[in-house]
Amino acid sequence: MASAKIRNIEKCKEEVLSICSEYQLNVLDISSKEIQLDDLHKQYVIDISTDCEDDDIYDKVYTRCGFINEERLPDADLTVNLNEVNI
């Protein structure tokens, strides 16, 4: 089954948050920005602050976000940064 294409950063952010939720990654803060690379291409940058210390969870989240990048973004590249915050 083909997944719908993602055409804006807010929808992309929702997808990333749902992946974090699926793997029980505690999201403390999330920010995003869209960078226009040229006339046709954009970059979506999503920064997530978390108190998670489990590298296995990080790997799973990055892998799933990579799927979004490869399969579902027709005109943008996605960069997800997971930043561990000590509370």
Give the residues covered by each predicted segment.
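Short glycine-/aliphatic-rich beta-strand segments at the starts of folded cytosolic domains
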Residues: 1-7
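Exposed, low-complexity/repetitive linear segments and helix-based recognition motifs
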Residues: 7, 26, 72-74
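Acidic, low-complexity, intrinsically disordered interaction modules
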Residues: 31-80
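Intrinsically disordered, low-complexity segments enriched in Ser/Pro/Gly/Ala and basic residues
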Residues: 2, 17, 30-31, 48
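Short amphipathic alpha-helix segments
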Residues: 9-28
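Short acidic DE-rich linear segments
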Residues: 84-87
